Amino acid sequence: MMAGCGEIDHSINMLPTNRKANESCSNTAPSLTVPECAICLQTCVHPVSLPCKHVFCYLCVKGASWLGKRCALCRQEIPEDFLDKPTLLSPEELKAASRGNGEYAWYYEGRNGWWQYDERTSRELEDAFSKGKKSTEMLIAGFLYVADLENMVQYRRNEHGRRRKIKRDIIDIPKKGVAGLRLDCDANTVNLARESSADGADSVPAQSGASVQSSSVRPLTSVDGQLTSPATPSPDAGTSLEDSFAHLQLGGDSIAERSHRGEGEEEHESPSSGRVPAPDTSIEETESDASSDSEDVSALVAQHSLTQQRLLVPNPSQTVSDRSVAAGGTVSVRSRRPDGQCTVTEV
């Protein structure tokens, strides 16, 4: 009858006689010099240490960071610049991998150069190539890729549209790095190029200059239907009331004079006047005259309307200067209020 789990005796007497009690387990089994990755469940290739001290393959961390910027074990956030500046446990292995163990190595195309595959993927590609296979699958950064050894391209198994060239070449050709990790000799220059191109920092000075120039130019403003720039002084807003009333008076006179002219005679009007005639107010004048006869209108309004009637219905043979002299040098002009009442201002 089998004994239960609780009946098993794990005492020191159960140990073999050739093993001492104080002997550690590491002496009985070979120690693992390369840590294991908790993502791919294999020995780490180019192991990196996160700020939380967990160790993974560089490509495994890269693939996990695309899905979420957190550690796969403790869920602590991964810094944004970790992929550009990873903490390698053994930087010397990267240089050794770039030198390679054989005569040939496998590369995939990058921007402005070639990247060397990591050691594990290179062994898989070399094994498939030596066996004459047409294609093989690779697990890279958490994604399954298909390497077409006939056309020498690679693509994701679930996305055939994105293809990248691959090649088998000698180990000593110029390269950007290994498995996305740049070599030390190119790190400084490449980081500067990345900072000036990826984030648009190189275009900031030009954009700032353009923005200052564009902000200094204000849009044109409209004054009485005419476009004026901010630098151009606007028309004098403090024009005296006398000029405005004189303008209205001359406009009324021109309307009265044009009523006695034939059609087409307005074209021969003297250009020295240079003034735009005021709109026709005959209807308003008629309404004001009719309201002066009602009992609700005050005597002051009636007096103003009579004065305006005398001004707006002049003798055709009398000029403006004659009327001004006859009135003793005083010109009275009617102005209409918003409430419909009329006032007369003496100039």
UniProtKB/Swiss-Prot annotation:
Native source species: Bos taurus (Bovine)
Catalysed transformations (reactions): S-ubiquitinyl-[E2 ubiquitin-conjugating enzyme]-L-cysteine + [acceptor protein]-L-lysine = [E2 ubiquitin-conjugating enzyme]-L-cysteine + N(6)-ubiquitinyl-[acceptor protein]-L-lysine
InterPro entries noted in UniProt: RING-HC_RNF146, RNF146, WWE-dom_subgr, WWE_dom, WWE_dom_sf, Znf_RING, Znf_RING/FYVE/PHD, Znf_RING_CS
Zinc finger (RING-type) in chain: 37-75
Keywords attached to this entry: Cytoplasm, Isopeptide bond, Metal-binding, Phosphoprotein, Transferase, Ubl conjugation, Ubl conjugation pathway, Wnt signaling pathway, Zinc, Zinc-finger
Pathway: Protein modification; protein ubiquitination
Ranges annotated as biased composition (Polar residues): 304-322
GO molecular function: poly-ADP-D-ribose binding; ubiquitin protein ligase activity; ubiquitin-protein transferase activity; zinc ion binding
Free-text function comment from the UniProt entry: E3 ubiquitin-protein ligase that specifically binds poly-ADP-ribosylated proteins and mediates their ubiquitination and subsequent degradation. Acts as an activator of the Wnt signaling pathway by mediating the ubiquitination of poly-ADP-ribosylated AXIN1 and AXIN2, 2 key components of the beta-catenin destruction complex. Acts in cooperation with tankyrase proteins (TNKS and TNKS2), which mediate poly-ADP-ribosylation of target proteins AXIN1, AXIN2, BLZF1, CASC3, TNKS and TNKS2.
Name of the molecule in the record: E3 ubiquitin-protein ligase RNF146-B
Region (Disordered): 196-241, 257-347
Disulfide bridge positions per record: none
Gene behind this protein: RNF146B
Known partners and oligomeric status: Interacts with poly-ADP-ribosylated AXIN1, AXIN2, BLZF1 and CASC3.
A Pfam match: WWE
Per UniProt, location of the Glycyl lysine isopeptide (Lys-Gly) (interchain with G-Cter in ubiquitin) cross-link in this chain: K85, K95, K131, K176
Record's compositionally biased regions (Acidic residues): 282-296
Post-translational modification: Ubiquitinated; autoubiquitinated. Autoubiquitination is enhanced upon poly(ADP-ribose)-binding.
Residue span, WWE domain: 92-168
Modified residues (Phosphoserine): S288, S292
Top-level lineage group: Eukaryota
Record-linked SUPFAM superfamilies: RING/U-box, WWE domain
